[in-house]
């Protein structure tokens, strides 16, 4: 994770994300850099617009949270009423079954 943080730090200060700069940031943080991981990260970030990726990653969270709450509340009240009706009907059915079971025991 520290490799990604180092890349984001370099990006935020406007420095080029390359092997040399990543090594310097990691060493300054007390991390012993691994060449393979640094090369893989630099290759993976090549051609990637980091600002755009950050914006896309943050955007759905804010957008998805607001609309999801409104429909859930409206539908939740209707569902609760339907569930209460269904429970009452089930209780009535159970009561009738218990009554019939009691009668069958009398005439068994």
From Swiss-Prot:
CDD domains, A to Z: Ribosomal_L12p (cd05832)
Keyword Ribonucleoprotein: yes
Pfam family, one: Ribosomal_60s
Keywords: Ribonucleoprotein, Ribosomal protein
GO biological process: translational elongation
Acidic residues composition-biased segments: 84-99
Region (Disordered): 67-108
Stretches that traverse the bilayer: none
GO molecular function, one term: structural constituent of ribosome
Domain of life according to the entry: Archaea
Entry GO CC: ribonucleoprotein complex; ribosome
InterPro entries, alphabetized: P1/P2_N_sf, Ribosomal_P1/P2, Ribosomal_P1_arc
Subunit-structure text: Part of the 50S ribosomal subunit. Homodimer, it forms part of the ribosomal stalk which helps the ribosome interact with GTP-bound translation factors. Forms a heptameric uL10/P0(P1)2(P1)2(P1)2 complex, where uL10/P0 forms an elongated spine to which the P1 dimers bind in a sequential fashion.
Homology family: Belongs to the eukaryotic ribosomal protein P1/P2 family.
Function field: Forms part of the ribosomal stalk, playing a central role in the interaction of the ribosome with GTP-bound translation factors. The stalk complex of P.horikoshii binds to E.coli large subunits and confers on them the ability to interact with eukaryotic elongation factors. Each succesive P1 dimer bound along the P0 spine increases the GTPase activity of elongation factors and increases translation by reconsituted ribosomes.
PANTHER family registered for this protein in UniProt: 60S ACIDIC RIBOSOMAL PROTEIN P1, LARGE RIBOSOMAL SUBUNIT PROTEIN P1
Protein name: Large ribosomal subunit protein P1
